[in-house]
Amino acid sequence: MRITIRDIQQMRDRGERIPMVTAYDYTSAQIADRAGIPLILVGDSLGMVVLGYNSTVPVTLDDMIHHTRAVVRGTQKALVIGDLPFLTYTSPEQAMQSAGRMLQEAGAQAVKLEGGVHIAPTIARLVQAGIPVMGHIGFTPQAVNQIGLRVQGRRAAEAQRLLADALAVQEAGAFAIVLELVPAELAQAITERLRIPTIGIGAGAGCSGQVQVWHDMLGLYSDFLPRHAKRYADLATIIAEALSQYASDVRNGTFPGPEHSSRMDPAELAAALGSQDQATE
């Protein structure tokens, strides 16, 4: 049985920290699900770590639906959240269409979108239509060309704006909210003032939960490692060593071995080749 947004709220109410990771394909989703991760985000971060873009801006809704479908097929328990990418929720009507596709075509159980006070009416419309929404404030990657890649909320005026954003997103009906690149003290203060869970990324330990990007935490993305990412494994090195060994085995003829091949009765082979040879004479 899948985890629900009610389960996530109960985790928060019990003081249980909530882990969330990104996943972008069937196999990764299976692994995360088996590991007991309750929230899986199909993030538009796939634009960088899977598709090779330098930001999330080029990612399309079709990209997101394609990858979300795969993640949903790979999970049985985790609640799967699909990001709405850049310029797919510029109005409540467009957001409804985009989120509807994410749930109906991709099978996601919820969507995530970026923004605070200005996006709250859109969140409210989605929630009223029965679409669970996770909010996202602080550093919002889709606005990187406007705000730059920097911590948000260090100054009092910025901090007040972020608190207002968080409260607006909550009152609009979001079931949780991501706080990205927010000072730890501010993130904790926001968390204490909200009724819904906060999921931090680069926002300190005072949030209700944490999210990490799959490729960052497993050492699969070498282009850039954010300060807030913790590398739990160096899978890129392990994979490269395995591929190098495979290439060596092929070149020196040790792979495939007899145990990797099928055999044929010699008499059957002789009969087949004999018939072929006669036909070509």
Swiss-Prot record:
List the protein's name.
3-methyl-2-oxobutanoate hydroxymethyltransferase
Known role: Catalyzes the reversible reaction in which hydroxymethyl group from 5,10-methylenetetrahydrofolate is transferred onto alpha-ketoisovalerate to form ketopantoate.
Q: Which family does it belong to?
A: Belongs to the PanB family.
Top-level taxonomy: Bacteria, Bacillati, Chloroflexota, Chloroflexia, Chloroflexales
Q: What is its main location?
A: cytoplasm
What gene name does this entry carry? Answer: panB
Q: Which reaction does it catalyse?
A: 3-methyl-2-oxobutanoate + (6R)-5,10-methylene-5,6,7,8-tetrahydrofolate + H2O = 2-dehydropantoate + (6S)-5,6,7,8-tetrahydrofolate
Entry note: cofactor: Binds 1 Mg(2+) ion per subunit.
Name what cofactor the protein needs: Mg(2+)
Protein species of origin: Chloroflexus aurantiacus (strain ATCC 29366 / DSM 635 / J-10-fl)
